């Protein structure tokens, strides 16, 4: 009974709050003519233009919207193009044979042109006050939208989007940009501003907190004070997001070319902990531990590789980020269980990755590669005979060597630095020189550990057990 009353009160208060917001923030449309903006059709995907023109020809409104418009206005090349329209998903499917409908939470139409997919969304409406709330819109107890397929007008759609800079609409009918929420001004001033009441919008979808940080880092903008204020105290809402979705978001955050700046802001707004709880436990006040240094360096290196259009692998990123928690876990298991270090290390890999996968559903294909990179660290110091050549034949040797170099860079460890330097020279040498380097190792072998002999038991006396 109490639960019913609480849910009823929550729904009434939420509706009153939403109605108050709508009353205060009635959309006022500003039309920016072609001569006052930088968008040209030659910079837009031909397939996106085909979708827009066909929808217009069929009598529907259709606009380019979201990050594509934002990036074009900033002079950047968009990664993809999204379309919004007053046509329903079923109506869109009737117009395009190469279309399929996707999504339960948000019903979308994907129009496929080979590898390129043009996403088409119907204008969203306000979910409160609709007679069809129960079947088309559903909220969780924390206010999160679980399902939202209320359709509306372009004015309502503009208010339903997340940030003002993503709520700009480009029309191929008259080449204008429509702005209902002041997005153009925020774009010019470099402001990330959430549309509507920030706490309500974050509760609807907590991932918006991650998006705010990502856009601020990616676009070199700042988050407005009212948008930033609730983030630290609402950060734990991310624990309610499915781990698979958080994994995808983590790649967008850390492997999009602005990973280091994003990492700093994630820590500032307390958003790193829900994503990487294992790592956060090892943070220090001055931020200068070996683990924090290796995270900073691997993200800077990743950013440089992306800027130079080089490939990056999430498995290597995770191998570096979780390396020091892994070492501490392995040492703890070895001390508590009495196992050999190699066996304790193997168990620690399982424990660290299992905990990581509880918050981020890291796919097995990546955890397998991460394990390979870690296991090779234990073999890098064993180079005598043919071991060095065999090690170099391993598919993940190069990634393992890169991690070794990173470790040498962030640790004040002369032995580790010499080992990394040896491997760098060995890889760059011709076979005869490599053989000479290995002979030098044989001439100066590392001191062997003395194995303790098993104790001899005293002879058992008669009458004793």
Curated annotation (Swiss-Prot):
Gene3D superfamilies: Beta Polymerase, domain 2, cca-adding enzyme, domain 2. SUPFAM superfamilies: Nucleotidyltransferase (SSF81301), Poly A polymerase C-terminal region-like (SSF81891). GO terms for molecular function: ATP binding; poly(A) RNA polymerase activity; RNA binding. The active site is at residues 80, 82, 162. Residues 448-459 have a biased composition (Basic residues). Transmembrane segments: none annotated. GO terms for biological process: mRNA processing; polyadenylation-dependent RNA catabolic process. Adds poly(A) tail to the 3' end of many RNAs, which usually targets these RNAs for decay. Plays a significant role in the global control of gene expression, through influencing the rate of transcript degradation, and in the general RNA quality control. It comes from the Bacteria. Keywords: ATP-binding, mRNA processing, Nucleotide-binding, RNA-binding, Transcription, Transferase. HAMAP family: PolyA_pol. It comes from Salmonella typhimurium (strain LT2 / SGSC1412 / ATCC 700720). It catalyses: RNA(n) + ATP = RNA(n)-3'-adenine ribonucleotide + diphosphate. Belongs to the tRNA nucleotidyltransferase/poly(A) polymerase family. CDD domains: NT_ClassII-CCAase. It holds the Pfam family PolyA_pol_arg_C. Residues 430-465 are annotated as: Disordered. This is Poly(A) polymerase I. Its EC number is 2.7.7.19.
């Amino acid at each position: 009974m109490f639960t019913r009353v609480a849910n009823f009160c929550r729904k009434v208060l939420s509706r009153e709050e939403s109605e108050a917001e709508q009353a205060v923030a009635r959309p006022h449309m500003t039309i920016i003519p072609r001569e006052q903006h930088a968008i040209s059709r030659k910079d837009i995907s031909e397939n996106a233009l085909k979708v827009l023109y066909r929808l217009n020809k069929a009598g529907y409104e259709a606009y380019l919207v979201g990050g594509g418009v934002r990036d074009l206005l900033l002079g950047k090349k968009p990664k993809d193009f999204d379309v919004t329209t007053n046509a329903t998903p079923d109506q869109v499917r009737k117009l395009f044979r190469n279309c399929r409908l996707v999504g339960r939470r948000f019903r979308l139409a994907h129009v496929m042109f080979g590898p390129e997919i043009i996403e088409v969304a119907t204008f969203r409406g306000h979910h409160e006050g609709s007679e069809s709330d129960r079947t088309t819109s559903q909220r969780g107890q924390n206010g999160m939208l679980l399902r939202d397929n209320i359709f509306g007008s372009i004015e309502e759609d503009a208010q339903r989007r997340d940030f003002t800079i993503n709520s700009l609409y480009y029309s191929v009918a008259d080449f204008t940009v429509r702005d209902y929420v002041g997005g153009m001004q925020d774009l010019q001033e470099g402001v990330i501003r959430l549309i509507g009441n920030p706490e309500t919008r974050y509760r609807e979808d907590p991932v918006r907190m991650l998006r705010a940080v990502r856009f601020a880092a990616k676009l070199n903008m700042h988050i407005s004070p009212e948008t930033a204020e609730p983030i630290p105290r609402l950060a734990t809402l991310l624990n309610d997001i499915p781990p698979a979705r958080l994994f995808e978001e983590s790649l967008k955050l850390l492997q999009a070319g602005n990973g280091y700046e994003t990492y700093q802001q994630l820590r500032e707004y307390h958003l790193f902990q829900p994503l990487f709880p294992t790592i956060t436990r090892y943070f220090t006040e001055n931020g200068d531990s070996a683990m924090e240094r290796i995270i900073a360096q691997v993200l800077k290196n990743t950013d440089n590789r992306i800027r130079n259009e080089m490939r990056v692998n999430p498995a290597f990123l995770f191998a570096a980020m979780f390396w020091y928690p892994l070492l501490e876990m392995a040492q703890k298991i070895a001390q508590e269980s009495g196992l050999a270090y190699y066996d304790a290390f193997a168990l620690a890999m399982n424990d660290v990755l299992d905990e990581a996968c509880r918050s981020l559903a890291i796919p097995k294909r990546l955890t397998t590669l991460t394990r390979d990179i870690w296991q090779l660290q234990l073999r890098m110091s064993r180079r005598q005979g043919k071991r060095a050549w065999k090690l170099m034949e391993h598919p993940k040797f190069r990634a393992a060597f890169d991690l070794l170099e990173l470790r040498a860079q962030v640790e004040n460890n002369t032995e580790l630095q010499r080992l990394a330097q040896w491997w760098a020279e060995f890889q760059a040498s011709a076979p005869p020189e490599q053989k000479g380097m290995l002979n030098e190792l044989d001439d100066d072998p590392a001191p062997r550990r003395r194995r303790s002999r098993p104790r001899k038991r005293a002879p058992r006396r008669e009458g004793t057990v």
